[in-house]
From Swiss-Prot:
Its EC number is 6.1.1.14. GO terms for molecular function: ATP binding; glycine-tRNA ligase activity; protein dimerization activity. It comes from Thermococcus gammatolerans (strain DSM 15229 / JCM 11827 / EJ3). The keyword DNA-binding does not apply. One of its GO terms (cellular component) is cytoplasm. Belongs to the class-II aminoacyl-tRNA synthetase family. One of its GO terms (biological process) is glycyl-tRNA aminoacylation. Gene3D superfamilies: 3.30.40.230, Anticodon-binding domain, Bira Bifunctional Protein, Domain 2. This is Glycine--tRNA ligase. ATP binds at residues 197-199, 207-212, 324-325, 443-446. HAMAP family: Gly_tRNA_synth_A. It holds the Pfam family HGTP_anticodon. It is found in: Cytoplasm.
Length: 570
């Protein structure tokens, strides 16, 4: 028996040679972490984006488009300036830099997710981990912010960043989007666009890029209403889950229906489970095989700074193992609360009650006669600040005064008697809440690569992409049996007819018919239409199936409708 062919190398060659994708800036030696999509790759990428767009639109979500460049203050508010970092280490001999956690994991075979820079440095020293390039000594570990920094405007006085996610453009527009949704929760907003992360050492081809495409939806909902109204439609869908407890105990995956997963407490509620099913169905619709999809729950130390719980939809790769393609995160009220605090904007939603309620609330203000001499010109400002506090903060103040008898506000030490505190009853017809957010976040580039890998079929006499038919970059190839009249003219006329009918179609008369069939099989074209010597006699052609290689004869008149049925199921 011969050696098993290296599927990865075969696919890389096919992608470069046939116009799917290749490393950027080739004539200048390339730059890691950047990829160009060729004519066929760009078409498949667009089709993936469209599948996701249609799925979001079926849920009634609105589409938005916002700038890639964002002022620094947005990312200060979102926490990215402080927390969007990776641990970095440098070789003291050759100057090469690496992800510290990756180097340690490769050297020791252990998971170091969540360890501090000091703990990572200690592991490097204890195990004498050296530079993988030259064997030199490694520096201490420090943190490196992954955002690309830029200057906005000609004076360079306004710092900005290329966005590391599309989500923040949605959050900062919440006030307008809420008005557009007529103040009615839940509602979803999505954006498809570029994101940028200055990865320390991008590897694994298209799986870790510095510039990539995302399709993110932010679903705003009332945290007290977490039952999805349409959950019954998806409750019997099976999900392959790898929850936290199974990872910690090495128990492997489990398969449950969405309903069972919620009842057993693996998925927090039906709202979350509904969108996990939606994500699975999108991956299937793209053409990812069901047995290559699973959902892995992120461990607490893995989760992003904004996440309360995250499940990753992962797709299996023969070369790279399980690869995260979609993250489904409960972001809570993190983003809207942070932007409210930093911007001063009101990003709440008024929830109306069915019946008015009587509620008790605290009124807290300063005793201005008593504190006036102490606070002087600041008295009025601090009094207004305290009165603007929410109920939770006012009750916190009362609790501190009860325990300690004093509190410091804006640098002034104030005693219990400096305040006027009353509990009052009030009839209210609704309340303002900060909505919570559930976020399904699709990468586009990873599903693109994994779709090709999982579609690649290697046979003795041919290698071809067994793409889902409606995902093929070229849907139909029109081929005259030989490049002679009248076959050429008839074939070209059919080609133009199919173009006008909306198919992605090519005309090709070069090489033998057998070579042409293999050429279009290789790139995933599901059907070749052949114009042969019978065509001038009875106006029929053959349709050849890529997967079975079988051919059927149909009339030229019925050809568009037959192809539409075969490719799109219409």
């Amino acid at each position: 028996m011969g050696e098993k062919p290296d599927k990865y190398e075969i696919l890389q060659d096919l992608m470069r040679r046939r116009g799917f994708a290749w490393g950027s800036f080739e004539i200048y030696g390339g730059s890691r972490g950047f990829y160009d999509y060729g004519p066929l790759g760009a078409t498949i990428k667009r089709k993936i984006e469209q599948k996701i767009r249609e799925a979001f639109q079926r849920e009634g979500f609105f589409e938005l488009e916002t700038p890639d460049i964002t002022p620094e203050k947005v990312f200060i508010a979102s926490g990215h300036v402080e927390k969007f970092v990776d641990p970095l280490v440098e070789c003291r001999k050759c100057g090469a830099r690496f992800r510290a956690d990756h180097i340690i994991e490769e050297a020791l075979g252990m998971d170091v997710e969540g360890l501090s820079a000091e703990e990572l440095t200690k592991l490097i020293r204890e195990h004498d981990i050296r530079c993988p390039e030259c064997g030199g000594e490694l520096s201490d570990v420090w943190y490196f912010n992954l955002m690309f920094e830029t200057k906005i405007g000609p004076y360079g006085d306004q710092k900005g960043y290329l966005r590391p996610e599309t989500a923040q453009g949605i959050f900062v527009n919440f006030k307008r989007l809420n008005a557009f949704a007529r103040n009615k929760l839940p509602f979803g907003v999505f954006q498809i666009g570029k994101a940028y992360r200055n990865e320390i050492s991008p590897r694994q081809g298209m799986l870790r890029l510095r510039e990539f495409t995302q399709a993110e939806a932010e679903i705003f909902f009332n945290p007290s209403e977490t039952e999805h109204p349409h959950f019954d439609e998806v409750k019997n869908e099976k999900l392959r889950l790898y929850p936290i407890e199974h990872q910690l105990k090495n128990l492997g995956e489990i398969e449950l229906t969405a309903e069972e997963a919620v009842k057993k407490g693996y998925i927090m509620n039906t709202f979350f489970a509904y969108y996990m099913v939606m994500v699975k169905r999108v991956l299937l619709d793209i053409g990812i095989p069901e047995d290559k999809i699973r959902f892995r729950q992120q461990l607490p130390e893995e989760r992003a700074h904004y996440s309360r719980d995250t499940w990753d939809a992962e797709v299996h790769s023969e070369r790279f193992g399980w690869v995260e393609c979609v993250g489904i995160a409960n972001r809570g009220d993190y983003d809207l609360s942070r932007h409210m605090r930093e911007s001063g904007a009101d990003l709440t939603v008024l929830i109306h009650y069915d019946e008015p309620k009587i509620v008790k609330r605290l009124e807290v203000s300063l005793n201005l006669k008593r504190v006036g001499p102490k606070l002087r010109k600041d008295a009025k400002r601090i009094n207004e600040l305290i009165k603007s506090w929410n109920e939770e903060k006012k009750r916190e103040l009362v609790e501190i005064l009860g325990k300690e008898g004093k509190i410091t506000i804006e640098g002034y030490e104030l005693e219990k008697d400096d305040f006027i505190i009353r509990e009052v009853e009030e009839k209210i017809t609704g309340e303002k809440i900060v909505p919570h957010v559930l976020e399904p976040s699709f990468g586009i580039d990873r599903p693109f690569y994994l779709l090709l890998e999982n579609s690649l079929v290697i046979e003795e006499d041919r290698t071809y992409l067994k793409l889902k038919k409606d995902m093929a970059p070229i849907e139909v190839a029109v081929l005259p049996l030989v490049a002679k009249e009248p076959l050429k003219s008839i074939a070209y006329e059919i080609f133009r007819k199919l173009q006008k009918a909306g198919f992605i179609v090519v005309y090709d008369e070069k090489d033998t018919i057998g070579r042409r069939y293999l050429r279009y099989d290789e790139i995933g074209t599901p059907y070749c239409v052949t114009i042969d010597n019978q065509t001038p006699e009875d106006s029929t052609v053959t349709i050849r199936d890529r997967d079975t290689r079988e051919q059927v004869r149909v009339s030229i008149e019925e050809l568009p409708s037959k192809l539409r049925e075969l490719i799109f199921g219409e």
